[in-house]
Design a protein with these regions (language model features):
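Domain-core detector
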Residues: 1-124, 130-138
């Protein structure tokens, strides 16, 4: 279904369509608003699909890292995870806060009071996490 915000957009579109077209029949108004609502549903569907793909990729990557550690192919005692955002004008505050964060291999990232083992931090998140070798303290 649609988010509360999207339902509000559809309601406002209905009111505007009725106001702007007082001579239209109810059927014509309904047809126009239905097309608009269906377009919003397509947008919502794409957001859900992108986010679920990001969750699946993040979970798969984490499972792979854990298996590599279990098999002794990487040493989690010298590995960290790094959160990598897309530092542009579309990056949200949470992702901006997480960008460049480094945590121990088996720990969570924290931003704005929430914790994340890996991406995504929210719907449509474009961030990724990667495993890095822990930097030696000098």
């Amino acid at each position: 279904g649609l988010t509360e915000h999207q339902e509000g957009k559809v309601s406002r579109y209905l009111l505007k369509t009725r106001t702007d077209n007082p001579t239209w029949s109810d059927e014509r108004v309904l047809a126009k608003v239905t097309r608009y609502r269906n377009a919003e549903i397509r947008v919502r569907s794409k957001v859900i699909a992108r986010t679920e793909i990001a969750y699946a990729a993040g979970n798969g990557k984490t499972a792979m890292w854990n298996q590599l550690a279990k098999d002794g192919l990487i040493d989690p005692n010298v590995m960290d995870k790094e959160w990598l955002g897309i530092a542009d004008n579309r990056q949200c505050g949470v992702c901006d806060e997480l960008n460049g964060s480094v945590v121990p291999f088996d720990k969570s990232f924290t931003a704005s009071g929430a914790t994340f083992m890996q991406e995504p931090a929210h719907p449509n998140c474009r961030c990724v996490t990667t495993v890095i070798t822990r930097k030696k303290k000098t």
